[in-house]
Amino acid sequence: MGRESVAVVTAPPSATAPGTASVATSLAPGFRFHPTDEELVSYYLKRKVLGQPVRFDAIGEVDIYKHEPWDLAVFSRLKTRDQEWYFYSALDKKYGNGARMNRATNRGYWKATGKDREIRRDILLLGMKKTLVFHSGRAPDGLRTNWVMHEYRLVEYETEKNGNLVQDAYVLCRVFHKNNIGPPSGNRYAPFMEEEWADDEGALIPGIDVKLRLEPPPVANGNDQMDQEIQSASKSLININEPPRETAPLDIESDQQNHHENDLKPEEHNNNNNYDENEETLKREQMEEEERPPRPVCVLNKEAPLPLLQYKRRRQSESNNNSSRNTQDHCSSTTTTVDNTTTLISSSAAATNTAISALLEFSLMGISDKKEKPQQPLRPHKEPLPPQTPLASPEEKVNDLQKEIHQMSVERETFKLEMMSAEAMISILQSRIDALRQENEELKKNNANGQ
């Protein structure tokens, strides 16, 4: 982990005007400029070609093919001991009207290795990535070194879409040094040195100056009433991401109890016996409700279980009205009072039975509907439907083709080995045939001489 800093000047130190110094801001330990291939092409290189600003200007500009790779560190905006640097570079065409590029330096040349790799976002082609290795000396006798460069360039689609025809004006180069042959490893990162960070003044964390204001700014005109209304409205909103609250069923039960209490208050003045009967009925209904499994309550629609309660309240209100009508002439005579009391008790009992039957009918309504509407058997098709195979994605097709290519290469090698073994066997048999033929000729000569 090296000490990294960001130079503010846009030109290399050699091109800096006299009398001006480059102001560097150190990055905090652990922070490195390590973007992905897609970010390098679609953000940094694209904005450089189009002349748009970037949020964190960490890539310097240099003619990379006019300098040796070990001399490029001084032109980097990230002053670090890590063996990895990023640069913008203008391409130098070898011929004016050709497509070949001149990648030769004073003491060597950059040689492309392998095929150019595509940089895609899903199926959209963003750019191309070329891998080059630095060779010291002159071709074709150059000596391979451990300096590697990844050259990123835009494709014509990106530039035509933005109305720019100079896609080859700049390329983005990532230069790094490997200690051994093979894929790059973590040895490009310099070790951490604690003495370099004795004072953390001026340490920068990229993006730390971005402040997100999650709360709205206060209103200066002093409309307190409007603010209170907005807050109350925001509290009354229901968040669909929150789990169902357990207080919703309790509110309904408390509402039901309050409603029953309000319905029973007039009957306290009319008849004490009727009040006792209704109180027992209410307790019995509450016990039945507690014994039943709790019904699911929807948070978005709290009025889901209310139709049953409204039905019960309507039946009880009708019974209360009947009882009040029956007890209007309570003071007329003793016989009338006794008859009205009997009628009130019977009506309240009938109302209770009606409410209980309504509960049973409501709970069994779904079962009866299912019994009344049996499922019709499906008619068999005359012809079986062909199985629908899912469409394979382009990535799966590419993987299948790669597997087939690998399998074909393995089979080809196997055939080569079998052919070589067959040729060896044929040569052995041919030598045996020649030996037998020669022996046969010698035997013929001996027989002829003996005769």
Swiss-Prot record:
One GO molecular function term? transcription cis-regulatory region binding
Coiled-coil regions listed in the entry: 272-292, 398-446
**Record keywords: Coiled coil included?**
yes
Provide the alphabetized UniProt keywords: Coiled coil, DNA-binding, Flowering, Nucleus, Plant defense, Repressor, Transcription, Transcription regulation
Record domain NAC: where? 27-178
Q: In which tissues is it expressed?
A: Mostly expressed in floral organs, and, at low levels, in other organs.
Subcellular compartments: Nucleus
Q: What is the effect of changing residue 32 to Q?
A: In sgs1; increased transgene promoter DNA methylation, reduced histone H3 methylation levels (e.g. H3K4me3 and H3K36me3), reduced polymerase II (PolII) occupancy and reduced transgene mRNA accumulation
Q: Which GO terms describe its biological process?
A: defense response; DNA-templated transcription; flower development; negative regulation of DNA-templated transcription; negative regulation of gene expression, epigenetic; negative regulation of transcription by RNA polymerase II; photoperiodism, flowering; pollen development
Q: What is its main location?
A: nucleus
Q: What induces it?
A: Induced by type III effector proteins (TTEs) secreted by the pathogenic bacteria P.syringae pv. tomato DC3000 during basal defense.
Gene Ontology cellular component annotations, sorted alphabetically:
nucleolus; nucleus
Its annotated function is as follows:
Transcriptional repressor that binds to the motif 5'-(C/T)A(C/A)G-3' in the promoter of target genes. Also binds to the 5'-CTTGNNNNNCAAG-3' consensus sequence in chromatin. Can bind to the mitochondrial dysfunction motif (MDM) present in the upstream regions of mitochondrial dysfunction stimulon (MDS) genes involved in mitochondrial retrograde regulation (MRR). Together with NAC050 and JMJ14, regulates gene expression and flowering time by associating with the histone demethylase JMJ14, probably by the promotion of RNA-mediated gene silencing.
Q: What assembly does the database describe for this protein?
A: Interacts with JMJ14 and NAC050.
Q: What is known of its domains?
A: The NAC domain includes a DNA binding domain and a dimerization domain.
Q: What is this protein called?
A: NAC domain containing protein 52
Q: State the species of origin.
A: Arabidopsis thaliana (Mouse-ear cress)
What's the source species' lineage?
Eukaryota, Viridiplantae, Streptophyta, Embryophyta, Tracheophyta
